[in-house]
């Protein structure tokens, strides 16, 4: 056979089988003889023979199936799970993926960091144990906030303290440290957004060490809630003012809030170097500029209180002069000490008292005088402080190194030769640090004029705690008892999120007792009361920290007087809370909610881009509500979620956190609008009545507008509904000339205890059984507060209205006059009487403060006129080339005003807007003859109707107010008989 026939075209062998070739390929090994194979008995002992036989049987049983025919479905290609993992492992088999497509099978490792936080505790010039000992064992503690206007140097002042207490801390090149600005958005925008607590140990002029628990607060006027929250648990205010800009709009509000809460003020005049290097004022003019700013602060204080204890003045020791950018802060005493340390021979206090005011120094006679004899005398402040300061600055920025070296040697300042080669600013910072050193003058001012927590305990208790002071809890708070047996009472005013933004720390002040890690406590919410204990949760303290801005000191416990961060108690807290121990003998009471300086009048609606992510949005809204004290979230009847804030900047930061930190989803945001209120401008045209559903009770009411000023007094806390009836009566008789009967008939404020509506009982005892009426008093109050919370026009709050209860007809049986009958009826009669009293809409108005050069004033006037705004005053700023313009602008027309202002003035103008008051929108909102035109702005008297229709549409309500919803048929017939025409 030919060789090519043995293979096919693919090279496969197809020839006949050859047994010889197969034997050559696979030769058979010779079988061993019996002599060659040893017996089992020789190799294996008798005791192991049984094991070997058993192993052979198992091996044979494993090999037997290899020669059997196995079906395809019975073949085993891989070992079973039991063979791989063992028989002790539970194995589950899932044939369908239970994870959604949006969730990866293997989750990536996410490091969500929203803030700068030091993982390792940095080195300090003091031991941490020493700091904790000061906080817990002594009264050498001061708790205060650092407040002021935007970019006036609050964070820089605390940076100055951080530089000297944290030796390893160095600022970035060509930038300030901003140690308390930990949020990434704060560092990106170069402005503080959140208040940040910082705890330090510092020494005064005598070397005594104090523990400072200071809180850096934002300066932007939109974030005044971050000022009010820590102020509620602080003992004083350090007010920072730029000497060139002077007292600004936010400074004024902070002063007012501090004086109303009886808090001492320490004034820091910052950026003194700008008078020398920028304005280049002569020393005598610089003195007048400094004095003018101090007088401006005192004028604002006097408008609130005439008490001299709040006055600030350098000779009193509560005014500091600083340039935080150059690294110095001094008082008259600390500067006088620099002279005495070099020359000696005089008392510091006596010398410092002669360094301010119209006191002159005669260099020839070396004596002080109250007036200059020849007219050429120099004030002592100018001679001893400003002139050396001017020399120090001017010589440093000049290139005369030898002259500077000679001048510095007179101050006993010796620098290295390479230091003279530095740029002017670093060189000036180095020289000022060598000359002034640690700001002991600032420490002295704070420790002398801001009381310790123990000294201030009685004042804080009287202002914040609503419980009885003569109880065991009240006495413990007054004494600031630190005993372990004392009742634990803490006040939470702020929530700070963790670095990953998943949880929150509760920022609290311990008023009495001791708190320990793992302790079981009761968390009482803002709505807690002895009658309604629903807003109370039992929790365990998971973590206790001493806040230090970028790091936290974890401790096992804290005592009364300390400000601490608490972990594990935030789940039930929305804004503020009271924390008490779970085994109190007396009934616990809560601390008052925070009285803020502004209102949330700016509103947007949000929704998720992907509707399936609504749960994430709701969770994010809950977290933003915790993080921002003045934010309010609400769900309208249309289902949309609305957020209320103070302004554009506030809302921008809140929405940034909502998108990137708390929900991590894409959201859609509506155009911003303003919040409205409802009011009445006339008395009800007829007595309005409403019957209960069972037709056995009738309530009659009349509405009239409140006198001007009452609403402001209620909101500012000048009158409180919880006062005794006699005290409330005396207040209205004295301030508003109410008669005795009217002033003693006040039942409630609405919609809450600080609401600007009043419910009065004007029924006569001859017509109404007062005992029966008192049995339904609480029901009528609830209906009144419900009605004033959600008005009939567009479901907004009613404001400045006096509701007078004229007549009540009640069923004699208690079962027929229960809450289910009286509450909705009281609400209906509030609405019907309100709608017959010329109802109107009210809109919020911003106070605008613009700083700009004189040539920008015409542009500012034009921009304000386009937005229904008007100028109140424009005045020049003393000692600066700027003008100050104060104006009013409606909130709904303010969107984009700041951007337009900067564009049209090429960035020369700077403005701040803050809520000022409510004003009535022109026009009748119920006038059906007005038809809003699409795509055209409403003008004049059409505004009210336009706002009403668009607001009701947005909320999912019908366009017009329904008559049958609020008026009984009998009431409608009575209106027709009286000739009253309702435009409903």
Curated annotation (Swiss-Prot):
Residue ranges, annotated region (G3): 216-219
Region (G1): 148-155
PROSITE patterns: G_TR_2
Keyword Lipoprotein: no
Location of region: Disordered: 1-28
InterPro entries per the UniProt record, alphabetical: EFG_III/V (IPR035647), EFG_V-like (IPR000640), EFTu-like_2 (IPR004161), EFTUD2_N (IPR031950), P-loop_NTPase (IPR027417), Ribosomal_Su5_D2-typ_SF (IPR020568), Ribsml_uS5_D2-typ_fold_subgr (IPR014721), Small_GTP-bd (IPR005225)
Chain residue ranges for the region called G4: 270-273
Nucleus found in the keyword field: yes
Stretches the record annotates as G2: 190-194
Span of domain tr-type G: 139-402
Gene Ontology molecular function terms on file: GTP binding; GTPase activity; U5 snRNA binding
Region (G5): 371-373
GO terms (BP aspect): mRNA cis splicing, via spliceosome; mRNA splicing, via spliceosome; regulatory ncRNA-mediated gene silencing; siRNA-mediated pericentric heterochromatin formation; spliceosomal tri-snRNP complex assembly
Location of the protein in the cell: Cytoplasm; Nucleus
Cellular component terms per the entry's GO annotation: cytosol; nucleus; pericentric heterochromatin; post-mRNA release spliceosomal complex; Prp19 complex; spliceosomal complex; U2-type catalytic step 2 spliceosome; U4/U6 x U5 tri-snRNP complex
Top-rank taxon, per record: Eukaryota
UniProt record similarity statement: Belongs to the TRAFAC class translation factor GTPase superfamily. Classic translation factor GTPase family. EF-G/EF-2 subfamily.
Job description of the protein: Component of the U5 snRNP complex required for pre-mRNA splicing. Binds GTP.
PANTHER family cross-referenced by the UniProt entry: 116 KDA U5 SMALL NUCLEAR RIBONUCLEOPROTEIN COMPONENT, TRANSLATION ELONGATION FACTOR-RELATED
Oligomeric form and interacting partners: Belongs to the 40S cdc5-associated complex (or cwf complex), a spliceosome sub-complex reminiscent of a late-stage spliceosome composed of the U2, U5 and U6 snRNAs and at least brr2, cdc5, cwf2/prp3, cwf3/syf1, cwf4/syf3, cwf5/ecm2, spp42/cwf6, cwf7/spf27, cwf8, cwf9, cwf10, cwf11, cwf12, prp45/cwf13, cwf14, cwf15, cwf16, cwf17, cwf18, cwf19, cwf20, cwf21, cwf22, cwf23, cwf24, cwf25, cwf26, cyp7/cwf27, cwf28, cwf29/ist3, lea1, msl1, prp5/cwf1, prp10, prp12/sap130, prp17, prp22, sap61, sap62, sap114, sap145, slu7, smb1, smd1, smd3, smf1, smg1 and syf2.
Name listed for the protein in its UniProt record: Pre-mRNA-splicing factor cwf10
Species, as recorded: Schizosaccharomyces pombe (strain 972 / ATCC 24843) (Fission yeast)
Organism phylogeny: Eukaryota, Fungi, Dikarya, Ascomycota, Taphrinomycotina
Gene label: cwf10
């Amino acid at each position: 056979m030919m060789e090519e026939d043995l293979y096919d075209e693919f090279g496969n062998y197809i020839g006949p089988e050859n047994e010889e070739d197969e034997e050559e390929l696979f030769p058979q090994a010779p079988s061993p003889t019996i002599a060659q194979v040893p017996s089992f008995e020789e190799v294996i002992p008798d005791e192991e023979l049984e094991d070997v036989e058993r192993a052979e049987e198992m091996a044979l049983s494993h090999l037997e199936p290899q020669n059997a025919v196995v079906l395809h479905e019975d073949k085993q290609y891989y070992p079973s799970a039991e063979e791989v993992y063992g028989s002790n492992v539970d194995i589950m088999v899932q044939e369908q993926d239970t994870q959604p497509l949006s969730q990866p099978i293997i989750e990536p490792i996410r490091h969500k960091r929203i803030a700068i936080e030091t993982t390792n505790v940095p080195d300090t010039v003091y031991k941490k144990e020493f700091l904790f000992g000061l906080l817990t064992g002594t009264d050498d503690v001061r708790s205060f906030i650092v407040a002021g206007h935007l970019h006036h140097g609050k964070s820089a002042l605390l940076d100055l303290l951080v530089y000297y207490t944290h030796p390893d801390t160095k600022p970035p090149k060509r930038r300030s440290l901003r140690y308390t600005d930990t949020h990434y958005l704060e560092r990106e925008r170069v402005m503080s957004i959140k208040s940040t607590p910082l705890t330090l140990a510092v020494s005064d002029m005598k070397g005594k060490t104090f523990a400072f628990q200071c809180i850096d607060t934002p300066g932007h006027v939109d974030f005044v809630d971050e000022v009010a929250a820590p102020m509620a648990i602080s003992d004083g205010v350090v007010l920072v003012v730029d000497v060139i800009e002077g007292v600004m709009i936010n400074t004024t509000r902070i002063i007012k809030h501090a004086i109303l809460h009886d808090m001492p003020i320490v004034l820091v005049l910052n950026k003194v170097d700008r008078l020398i290097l920028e304005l280049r004022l002569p020393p005598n003019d610089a003195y007048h500029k400094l004095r003018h700013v101090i007088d401006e602060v005192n004028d604002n204080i006097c408008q609130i209180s005439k008490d001299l204890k709040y006055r600030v003045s350098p000779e009193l020791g509560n005014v500091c002069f600083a340039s935080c950018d150059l690294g110095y802060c001094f008082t008259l005493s600390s500067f006088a000490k620099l002279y005495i340390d070099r020359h000696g021979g005089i008392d510091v206090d006596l010398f410092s008292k002669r360094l301010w005011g119209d006191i002159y120094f005669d260099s020839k006679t070396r004596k002080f005088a109250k007036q200059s004899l020849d007219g050429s005398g120099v004030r002592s402040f100018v001679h001893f402080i400003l002139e050396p300061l001017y020399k120090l600055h001017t010589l440093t920025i000049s290139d005369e190194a030898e002259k500077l070296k000679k001048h510095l040697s007179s101050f006993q300042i010796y620098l290295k030769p390479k230091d003279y080669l530095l740029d002017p600013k670093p060189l000036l910072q180095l020289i000022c640090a060598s000359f002034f050193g640690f700001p002991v003058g600032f420490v002295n001012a704070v420790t002398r004029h801001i009381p310790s927590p123990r000294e201030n305990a009685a004042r804080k208790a009287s202002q914040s705690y609503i419980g009885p002071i003569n109880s065991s809890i009240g006495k413990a708070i007054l004494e600031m008892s630190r005993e372990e047996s004392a009742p634990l009472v803490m006040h939470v005013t702020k929530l700070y999120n963790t670095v990953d933004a998943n949880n929150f720390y509760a920022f609290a002040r311990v008023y009495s007792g001791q708190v320990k890690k793992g302790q079981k406590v009761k968390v009482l919410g803002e709505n807690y009361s002895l009658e309604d204990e629903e807003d109370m949760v039992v929790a365990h303290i998971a973590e206790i920290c001493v806040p230090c801005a970028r790091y936290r000191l974890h401790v096992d416990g804290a005592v009364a007087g300390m400000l601490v961060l608490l972990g594990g108690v935030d789940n039930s807290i929305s804004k503020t809370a009271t924390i008490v121990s779970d085994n109190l003998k007396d009934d616990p009471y809560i601390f008052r909610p925070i009285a803020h300086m502004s209102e949330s009048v700016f509103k947007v609606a949000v929704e998720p881009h992907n509707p399936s992510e609504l749960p994430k949005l709701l969770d994010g809204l809950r977290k933003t509500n915790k993080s921002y004290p003045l934010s309010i979230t609400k769900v309208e009847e249309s289902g949309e979620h609305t957020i209320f804030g103070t302004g554009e900047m506030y809302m921008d930061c809140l929405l940034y956190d909502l998108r990137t930190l708390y929900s991590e989803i894409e959201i859609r945001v509506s155009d911003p609008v303003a919040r409205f209120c409802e009011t009445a401008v006339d008395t009800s045209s007829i007595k309005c009545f409403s019957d209960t559903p069972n037709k056995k009770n009738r309530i009659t009411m009349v509405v009239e507008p409140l006198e001007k000023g009452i609403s402001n007094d209620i909101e500012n806390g000048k009158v409180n509904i919880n006062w005794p009836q006699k005290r409330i009566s005396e207040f209205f008789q004295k301030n508003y000339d109410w008669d005795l009967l009217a002033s003693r008939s006040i039942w409630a404020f609405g919609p809450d205890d600080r609401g600007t509506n009043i419910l009065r009982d004007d029924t006569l005892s001859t017509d109404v059984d007062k005992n029966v009426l008192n049995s339904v008093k609480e029901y009528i109050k609830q209906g009144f507060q419900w009605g004033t919370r959600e008005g009939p026009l567009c479901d907004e709050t009613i404001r400045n209205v006096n509701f007078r209860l004229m007549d009540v007809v009640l069923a004699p049986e208690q079962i027929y006059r229960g809450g289910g009958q009286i509450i909705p009826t009281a609400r209906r009669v509030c609405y019907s009487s309100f709608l017959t009293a010329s109802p109107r809409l009210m809109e919020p108005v911003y106070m605008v403060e613009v700083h700009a050069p004189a040539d920008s004033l015409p542009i500012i006037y034009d921009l304000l006129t386009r937005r229904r705004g008007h100028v109140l005053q424009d005045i020049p700023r003393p000692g600066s080339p700027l003008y100050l313009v104060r104006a009013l602008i409606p909130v709904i027309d303010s969107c984009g005003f700041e951007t337009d202002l900067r564009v049209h003035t090429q960035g020369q103008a700077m403005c701040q807007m803050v809520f000022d008051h409510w004003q009535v929108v022109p026009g009748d909102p119920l006038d059906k003859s007005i038809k809003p035109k699409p795509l055209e702005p409403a003008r004049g008297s059409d505004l009210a109707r336009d706002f009403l229709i668009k607001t009701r549409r947005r909320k999912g309500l019908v366009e017009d107010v329904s008559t049958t919803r609020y008026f009984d048929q009998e009431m409608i017939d009575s209106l027709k008989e009286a000739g009253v025409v309702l435009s409903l």
